Design a protein with these regions (language model features):
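Metal-dependent phosphoesterase signature
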Residues: 2-37, 45-47
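A generic structural signal for short
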Residues: 26-27, 48-49, 80, 104
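Hydrophobic beta-strand core positions in alpha/beta domains
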Residues: 50-51, 128
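Asp-based, Mg2+/Mn2+-dependent phosphohydrolase catalytic module
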Residues: 40-43, 57-158
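A short, conserved alpha-helical patch in the ABC ATPase nucleotide-binding domain
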Residues: 1-2, 64
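Conserved phosphate-coupling serine/threonine residues in phosphotransfer and NTP-handling enzymes
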Residues: 53-55
Length: 158
C-alpha cells in the first residue's frame, strides 16, 4: 500500500488504521454459514486448531471476537511475528510446532493463492476453499471444496 500511495510504510499503516476506524467491517456478515458447524465437529473430535493469518493480529482477533470463534482455536498466529509471510511456509511450520503436531499431519484450509502455496511449501495437506467471487490458483491444493462441510469427509481420507 505504501508503494502504491507513494508514502512511507508508517504513513500507510496510519491511513489503514484510520480507515478501519472510520469504516469498520462487520465480520459476522462475512462468516460462512457452515463455519461454526465444522468448527464444532472438529473440536468435538479433539483436533487441535489454530488460526495462522498473514494479517495483523489486532484485526485477526477482532474478527474472532465479532464472530465468537475464539473458543475453537488453541493458537492464534499472526504474520506480523515473522520475517517472511505467505507464501513462505514459516507461519504454518511455527503454528504446527505450537500445536505440537508434525506438519505432515496438519490440514490447512485456505482461501488464497499465497496461503495455498504456503501450506504446500510446509508439506501440509491443503484444502482450497473456492469462492466464486475470487479467482485464485488452486493447483497446489490437495483438495478443492466449495463448502466447508466437505472437510468432514476429507479428514477421514487423510
Amino acid at each position: 500500500i505504501a508503494k502504491f500511495l507513494n508514502v512511507s510504510p508508517e504513513i500507510a499503516a496510519a491511513y489503514h488504521t484510520q480507515f478501519n476506524i472510520d469504516f469498520p467491517t462487520d465480520f459476522t456478515k462475512l462468516l460462512r454459514p457452515e463455519a461454526v458447524e465444522l468448527l464444532e465437529y472438529l473440536k468435538d473430535l479433539g483436533y487441535p486448531m489454530a488460526v495462522a493469518s498473514s494479517g495483523r493480529l489486532i484485526r485477526t482477533m477482532n474478527k474472532l471476537d465479532q464472530c465468537d470463534l475464539h473458543k475453537y482455536f488453541d493458537v492464534v498466529i499472526s504474520g506480523e511475528q515473522f520475517k517472511e509471510t505467505k507464501p513462505h511456509p514459516e507461519i504454518f511450520l511455527h503454528t504446527a510446532k505450537q500445536l505440537n503436531v508434525d506438519p505432515e499431519d496438519c490440514m490447512v484450509i485456505e482461501d488464497s493463492t499465497m496461503g495455498i502455496t504456503a501450506g504446500y511449501n510446509a508439506g501440509m495437506c491443503v484444502v482450497a476453499l473456492r469462492d466464486p467471487r475470487f479467482n485464485f490458483d488452486t493447483s497446489l491444493a490437495t483438495y478443492v471444496v466449495d463448502n466447508l462441510l466437505e472437510v468432514k469427509q476429507l479428514i477421514h481420507k487423510k
